[in-house]
Amino acid sequence: MAYRLLRALFRGLFRVTIDGVTDQFKHEKLIITPNHVSFLDGALLALFLPIKPVFAVYTSITDTWYMRWLKPYVDFVALDPTNPMAIKHLVRMVEQGRPVVIFPEGRITVTGSLMKIYDGAAFVAAKSGAAVVPIRLDGPEFTHFGRLQGVLKTRWFPKISIHVLPATTIPMPQAPRSRERRVLAGEHLHTIMMAARMATVPRETLFEALLSAQTRYGRFKPCIEDVSFKEDSYQTLLKKTLGVSRILQRFTVPGEHVGMLLPNATITAAAIFGASLRGRIPALLNYTSGAKGLQSAIIAASLKTIVTSRQFLEKGKLTHLPEQVNEVNWVYLEDLKDTVTLTDKLWILFHLCFPRRAMLPQQADDSALILFTSGSEGNPKGVVHSHASLLANVEQIRTIADFTPRDRFMSSLPLFHAFGLTVGLFTPLMTGSRVFLYPSPLHYRVVPELVYDRNCTVLFGTSTFLGNYARFAHPYDFARVRYVVAGAEKLAESTKQIWQDKFGIRILEGYGVTECAPVVAINVPMAAKVNTVGRILPGMEARLINVPGIAQGGRLQLRGPNIMRGYLRVENPGVLEQPSAENAQGELDANWYDTGDIVTLDEQGFCAIRGRVKRFAKLAGEMVSLESVEQLAISLSPEGQHAAAAKTDSAKGEALVLFTTDSEITRERLIKVARENGVPELAVPRDIRVVKALPLLGSGKPDFVTLGKMAQDPEMSV
């Protein structure tokens, strides 16, 4: 009777629902592993699961007053973490057929993300051979029984959902020592718990996700700021979004690709969400690519309109672009302010109260946004992402990193790059964190000062940018920073060292590609390994394809929820080319993406980048990584600029060419460094050319197309 009354009370107050594979509880040996978000979790599971399980509870909790009050109603076993026999007792209970609930985190979350996973539950599952049923609890964290007051917008009776995931097993790992087996089993369970989080993420559009964040963290929660130093709340950002959307629909149609040439600013975020909610697909244009790059993007994405700002064009010295690129309609935001009518204002006011009614019908799998590749190996390609792929990458990041609304992001990487867009805009907005948008990562003195002034805790950048910030920053500028992540290029040893020595901060290296929205792997404090880019993100499948001539590693191919919808190419304008990759048998597999990168994956799943397939030279039948050649030069001259290319050679097929800004680099010095590092002499170039500067793309990456031409033609210069 008491159970029925409590169940009815909870269902009435919290609108509790349970979904998923509820017949999973029929296994003979069963362990249930829920996430832990509040003090209500145990009561919810006891009341709503179709079985009566035993709860494994730490002795520090069993002695509390409320556990003594619950003892007549809930079956639990005291678990002493200091007693090794406690695990054996649990194993015996499972083997006897008693379903056991173990909270693998061991404590209630204080971040909203997964906490540390204890390996005890995993070892019990592996030892007993029990089925493991992960459960995802959503909603109790918003109650006053959680530990996220001040982090989330708490309320008395939020809706609670209990998601039951399919059962799985944890095989006993193969390792010589018991301690190693426990650790490996724990990592397996951590993977299961991360997959459970990813499996229960709601399928939303970008605009719906923004509204969900507003509900979750509060409409008046400050969320975004730019160089105007006026911080906007979710409500103010929504108002600007609705305003831009209302104006954009006058000169565009639903489904149209709309070019956007805008800086890192709040209005850019409003333009992206505003276009999206009215069914337009923003194409974020690289303003450093010049007229030629813009024309390629216009052709590939079939653009008719480009939205920009007169002030931005003037400050960026880009006023020549509208004259040189005159095949599209240029729309200036400044000109649109005076066109807002009373009807528009009333429309905005109404939809501030009912924002979901402003959105045109859309699905999560519909095209949401177009980004463009850097063009380092040919014409830039349009990369079309869906709402689902972009938001999946955000959730993958949030699953492994403990970002909270207490964090402040410094976002100086351009929003037209996937790295800047996903980690610098979407991730903080969907996490409730504050973000400061700065228009240029090249202001090496200003960015550290702003990090200090705005109390930023999260900083993303390339190795080059981070190295320069460290050179000009005061030792106290990064005192509050807890996450520094490097991506887009290999992290230089000198950059890593100066951050450690000057600020006491470990840079975490990551890896991504535009086609994956972009993050593929990342080191985080909970799982980091030196000289790797971290583990592949949860929800992604990875496979390595053998490349003839390359002994270590293989060509990385990926599949997952964050993979793009497809390419838009200059050669086939407006036609979406869906992703596919050639498997080991030479057959094309749909929905796989071939990164073109040679990587190795160790036994713990950590990924190390060896180079790009296109950046290997074949010398007398041997494959030599051009990046390894560049690393030799960097070790000799960390401050210089170096890039390697290949040229045709009648004797060996191809020969190496090193371009460098350091005139003191010689073949003899390179040979010495190569011997010290165990690099074969074959990887030391004979042709060393000193240049004033390397040819660079707008992204700051070397222009390998131009370098390849320079390698073939000794007379050609930058």
From Swiss-Prot:
List the subcellular locations: Cell inner membrane
For this UniProt record, the keywords arranged alphabetically read as follows: Acyltransferase, ATP-binding, Cell inner membrane, Cell membrane, Ligase, Membrane, Multifunctional enzyme, Nucleotide-binding, Transferase, Transmembrane, Transmembrane helix
Q: What is its EC number?
A: 2.3.1.40, 6.2.1.20
Q: Care to name a GO molecular-function term for this sequence?
A: acyl-[acyl-carrier-protein]-phospholipid O-acyltransferase activity
Q: Which residues form the active site?
A: H36
Q: Region (Acyltransferase): which ranges?
A: 15-138
Q: Which GO terms describe its cellular component?
A: plasma membrane
Query: Superkingdom of the source?
Result: Bacteria
Its GO biological process terms?
fatty acid metabolic process; phospholipid biosynthetic process
Tell me what topology the record assigns in the membrane: Multi-pass membrane protein
Give the principal location in a single coarse category: membrane
Where, by residue number, does the polypeptide cross the bilayer? 258-277, 409-433
Gene3D superfamilies, sorted? 3.30.300.30, N-terminal domain of ligase-like
Quick one: where's region AMP-binding? 233-646
Q: Which HAMAP family match?
A: Aas
Instruction: Write out the function statement from the record.
Output: Plays a role in lysophospholipid acylation. Transfers fatty acids to the 1-position via an enzyme-bound acyl-ACP intermediate in the presence of ATP and magnesium. Its physiological function is to regenerate phosphatidylethanolamine from 2-acyl-glycero-3-phosphoethanolamine (2-acyl-GPE) formed by transacylation reactions or degradation by phospholipase A1.
**UniProt name for this protein:** Bifunctional protein Aas
Q: Which organism is it from?
A: Yersinia pestis (strain Pestoides F)
Lineage, please? Bacteria, Pseudomonadati, Pseudomonadota, Gammaproteobacteria, Enterobacterales
